[in-house]
């Protein structure tokens, strides 16, 4: 999940600066979850459900948001030094607003996954990425 929140000098977090996951209302969504470093837990508090994220294993969460609104999300697994900074927002919007938001991301060149170079544990045994080989 990474560090999502950047506190100010007094330790306060400006929630408007957190990353926001946009979801279309009344449309089934499937989220693919995996971890780049340690076990995390993807939690959207008002959805009353969380899903664990593991290294080297994809986990899926399928659901249908039924109410437009803004919701808080966070990592629910004590995962390390910056655990309390792993915060995000969720915005459930109309299908038209969702499509418009996706178009704005694409126009800005924001498509696809984050580069694998950001994987902290890309040399785990069995991944085939070790510089010394997997012998």
Show which residues each predicted segment covers.
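Non-transmembrane, membrane-proximal soluble domains of secreted or membrane proteins
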Residues: 1-135
């Amino acid at each position: 999940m990474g560090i999502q929140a950047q506190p100010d000098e007094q330790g306060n977090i400006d929630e408007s600066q957190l990353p926001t996951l946009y979801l279309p209302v009344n449309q089934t969504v499937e989220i693919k979850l995996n971890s780049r470093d340690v076990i995390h837990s993807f939690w959207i508090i008002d959805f009353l459900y969380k899903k664990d994220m593991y290294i080297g294993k994809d986990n899926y969460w399928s659901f249908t948001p039924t109410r437009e609104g803004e919701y808080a999300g966070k990592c629910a697994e004590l995962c390390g030094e910056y655990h309390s900074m792993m915060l995000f927002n969720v915005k459930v919007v109309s299908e038209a607003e969702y499509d418009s938001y996706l178009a704005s991301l694409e126009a800005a060149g924001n498509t696809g996954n984050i580069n694998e170079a950001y994987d902290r544990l890309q040399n785990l045994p069995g991944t085939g990425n070790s510089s010394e080989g997997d012998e």
